[in-house]
Amino acid sequence: MIQYFVQVDIHADYDLVQLIGEGWYSRVYLAEHRTTRDEVVLKAINSNLVTADEFCREYQSSIGLWPHKNILRVYDAVFQCDGYFMFAMEYAPLGDLTSNISELGLGELHTKRVCCQVGSALQWIHSKNLCHLDVKLDNILVFKSDFTLVKLCDFGGVRVQGDIVIKKNELLPYCPAELVAKHANEYYQVDRVQDVFQFGIVVFFCLLGVLPWQKADRTDPNFQEFCAWRDKRSSKVK
């Protein structure tokens, strides 16, 4: 575990080129090192909203899962600046999968390429007895325009298989039905099948360019239609 954080003036070492992402507790910047001119991504996590232990868990999960060719590289440096915990990651020049998919999807060939790589990354994570829990288009970064290199990122939600956690505001289209049914702040057990469910949503979107439903709940007509199809197939198997 990291015992302390070096206080630095981030502007002395980096030029912040642009803000490329922002969440409720963090910001992500494209930056250029003033000396080497290397481009990196800096993730800045608000220290008033996240504890040092929570930040360390995300950083250690990120750096511990590399090297794998389809896991985003995190560099071996952490620091603190202006009320933020920060670490540096490699830069994905083509952005995330969301910005690379048309309204018609990726097509079968590119979908196969993406899914083979993301599947390999998830298999690696699961082999460590861990679950990602946030597999979505925004967390798959594109490094080559023909999709021969994509990488899974954002390991802030990584937990050990079987851990008991509190339900927060999971992104509904990616949330399995058993979690949709739970109330906010209710406890549930982490399982790798949640990653598999989310991965399935990614595959669907890559092929068709749309989400299968807004939420995995019987009140959603698209999910209701899926359940009817699934139940019909199950009865035939019997």
What are these regions (language model features)?
Residues 27-32, 36-47:
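Glycine-rich ATP phosphate-binding loop
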